[in-house]
Amino acid sequence: MKKRPAQHIIPGMPPGIIIPSDSAQHPRGVDLLTYSADAVDERPGLAVDDALAAIRAVTQAPATPPQVLWLNVSGLADAQLLKKIGEALTLHPLAMEDVVSLRQRPRVDNYDSHLYIPLKILQQDDNALTFNQLSIFLLNNLVVTFQEQTGDVLDAVRLRIRHGSG
């Protein structure tokens, strides 16, 4: 297994500050998946402002049948992007700090407006096992995922949603 680099902790910084690790990968945009019992709409590689505008439009005018939105970010190096998403969706600052802190243990944190679930994903790359962090936020009709690496570990979930079995 590959060993992770040490996490940078800056003494005196207030809690909730987003500081990506040196090994973090830059996101390639965000992916937005909107689905209901009847339809699936995928928009990969969106600018964050476009994705947040689409989320606001759906949440302000609920559709029939109800829709679920899934915002996915792969790569955690862009602190401003992460901060913008966290503030726009009112995600707890300590949970957003934990998104970039790659030594989180799996757990469920219950905040007023959402749940935060950090998980470890085991992957095999070039005969080596690696652990990658997957952070999940569950809100009302909205799922937000942050993947440590730009490779997508959630393709199987998307496939099930596309075929109506997810």
Give the location of each predicted region.
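Peripheral, non-transmembrane regulatory/ligand-interaction domains of membrane transport proteins
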Residues: 1-166
